[in-house]
Amino acid sequence: MNQVELLSPAGNLKKLKIALNYGADAVYGGVSHFSLRNRAGKEFTLETFKEGIDYAHALNKKVYATINGFPFNSQLKLLEEHIDKMAELEPDAFIIAAPGVVKLALKIAPHIPIHLSTQANVLNLLDAQVFYDLGVKRIVCARELSLNDAIEIKKALPNLELEIFVHGSMCFAFSGRCLISALQKGRVPNRGSCANDCRFDYEYYVKNPDNGVMMRLVEEEGVGTHIFNAKDLNLSGHIAEILSSNAISALKIEGRTKSSYYAAQTTRIYRLAVDDFYHNTLKPSFYASELNTLKNRGFTDGYLMRRPFERLDTQNHQTAISEGDFQVNGEITEDGRFFACKFTTTTNTAYEIIAPKNAAITPIVNEIGKIYTFEKRSYLVLYKILLENNTELETIHSGNVNLVRLPAPLPAFSFLRTQVRV
């Protein structure tokens, strides 16, 4: 049995390193607005993206470059130049949505495999066959595809790799084909600048056809409703069914623009879930509790296991997003000697340490604080908050950009967190 690949988002170089250190087999990201994430695209330059590719390859891991926007005629020359520049960086694949761009990429860089973006909305064998014949090596399935349909496609096209999303935000529209943001904000989703208008609260109005009078329908709270707001996808409880099907080559986590902790925690938990499957030690309740430490819109298992008409629980009408069960207080620097404060942090408080896969944490006690283990979890308690410039504090807030000294080095890219909700 070939082990499934775990693919994590890389919104910038730091998140790329975090995802790989927390157990991702590969990451995906891009440069410029052609990558369908304007903000994330701006956080990578050609130079830092190349640095990320080299970093991944040194770990025997992969980087897939996103070129999955839908270009207009006026952009085609720039697109051609962009593909050529990206090919020089030697990514392990291009993720592309438009068939014309697929053909262009194969012409410019025939040695780089093509992964078809979920934006292409492949839902059936006929479409899969067309793209396979075009030269696509892997299809990132539409979120609306069922597992049974994926199995049928794999049986018919055994050399075609299938990738599915297992976690992250879901669009209200059909796999991202949405114009709400373009109409209301002039920001076009399929060119990478979605304003997430589906997350806003809206008010209902009715119109009298006789006189044109508009009347607002007042909800019980009187504050509108999140009528378009889709819950977040979470398939951590279905890893056994997915991997037992032998149809899926890669599990993908959404979230290039989300936090560093999100990149770490989702990768950490899905890495654990995949490894547990192969060792027959699955712990779905643990995965669920850990994923609830993240900000989310409520979770749904989407449409992979059940069809859309069979369920009415994929939306959250109450709120655009909810805080997670844990608060991130600090991010450990890459050299492991300091942490950056992300939330109010005080002395004599125990902060749980979340560390990369297989990282070693050594207990220690000294004048700055102690690092210890309790019930298979590691914690940090600070006796004093000593900044990098040797200023001593009893409390530090997130607005303070000075790094804080640790009692002893911790694994690079670790996090400090506290529970805020049981």
From Swiss-Prot:
Gene designation: trhP
Annotated protein name in UniProt: tRNA hydroxylation protein P
Role played: Involved in prephenate-dependent formation of 5-hydroxyuridine (ho5U) modification at position 34 in tRNAs, the first step in 5-carboxymethoxyuridine (cmo5U) biosynthesis.
Family: Belongs to the peptidase U32 family.
GO molecular function, one term: peptidase activity
GO BP annotations listed: proteolysis; tRNA processing
Enzyme Commission code(s) on record: 3.4.-.-
Top-level taxon of the source organism: Bacteria
InterPro entries in the record: Peptidase_U32, RNA/ubiquinone_mod_enzymes
Keywords, comma-separated and alphabetical: Hydrolase, Protease, Signal, tRNA processing
Organism: Helicobacter pylori (strain ATCC 700392 / 26695)
Upper classification of the organism: Bacteria, Pseudomonadati, Campylobacterota, Epsilonproteobacteria, Campylobacterales
Listed PANTHER family: PEPTIDASE U32 FAMILY (PTHR30217), TRNA HYDROXYLATION PROTEIN P (PTHR30217:SF6)
Signal peptide: 1-58
